[in-house]
Amino acid sequence: MTETPNTSSEEIQTSEPSSDNELQTLQQENANLKAELKEKNDRYLMALAEAENSRKRLQKERTEMMQYAVENALLDFLPPMESMEKALGFASQTSDEVKNWAIGFQMILQQFKQVFEDKGVVEYSSKGELFNPYLHEAVEIEETTDIPEGTILEEFTKGYKIGDRPIRVAKVKVAKFPTKGNNDSNEEKE
């Protein structure tokens, strides 16, 4: 005798749609989980990129703050260093004893200049150059026809820069062509 299963054909037919529904439900759940995983992965990657950008920005800001702190400290040393240079300029007109002292101070001044050089601070000369508002501050203007307009005639304080960026602009006297009104008034006086 052969045994037949107790399931009828109606039961088999009803179980098939049930398994189709289950399959569709599972596929839908799988698709939903994949979408959720992709969304969370995208959010994770975005957060990771934001964290990396923040780290880089903070590092850059820290470097800039250190650079500006060093620049400000160096700027504080410029006036006394320049005063020492001026004083040493007069040492040759004094006694031998003062000249000997001046030699020692000249060595100290050279050490200061070496520190500036090591930090990338460069002194720039302006006399005879064309006025550049990025590098110069015009504190005096002299009207003249002998020298091209915008030429720096005299430098009152030296300029210093690190790389291409000035940390202290040079204070200068600039040549300017006389204005027509000034020539007329000069001619009338003569």
From Swiss-Prot:
Keyword hit for Transferase: no
Give the main localization category.
Answer: cytoplasm
Q: Which UniProt keywords are listed? A: Chaperone, Cytoplasm, Stress response
The alphabetized list of GO BP terms reads: protein folding
GO CC, alphabetical:
cytoplasm
Tell me the domain of life. Bacteria
- A molecular function GO annotation: protein-folding chaperone binding
* Span list, region Disordered: 1-34
PROSITE patterns cross-referenced by the UniProt entry: GRPE
Which InterPro entries does the record associate with it? GrpE (IPR000740), GrpE_coiled_coil (IPR013805), GrpE_head (IPR009012)
* PANTHER family linked to this entry: GRPE PROTEIN, GRPE PROTEIN HOMOLOG, MITOCHONDRIAL
Read off the HAMAP family from this record: GrpE (MF_01151)
Record family assignment: Belongs to the GrpE family.
The protein's role, per its UniProt record: Participates actively in the response to hyperosmotic and heat shock by preventing the aggregation of stress-denatured proteins, in association with DnaK and GrpE. It is the nucleotide exchange factor for DnaK and may function as a thermosensor. Unfolded proteins bind initially to DnaJ; upon interaction with the DnaJ-bound protein, DnaK hydrolyzes its bound ATP, resulting in the formation of a stable complex. GrpE releases ADP from DnaK; ATP binding to DnaK triggers the release of the substrate protein, thus completing the reaction cycle.
Complex formation:
Homodimer.
Name of protein = Protein GrpE
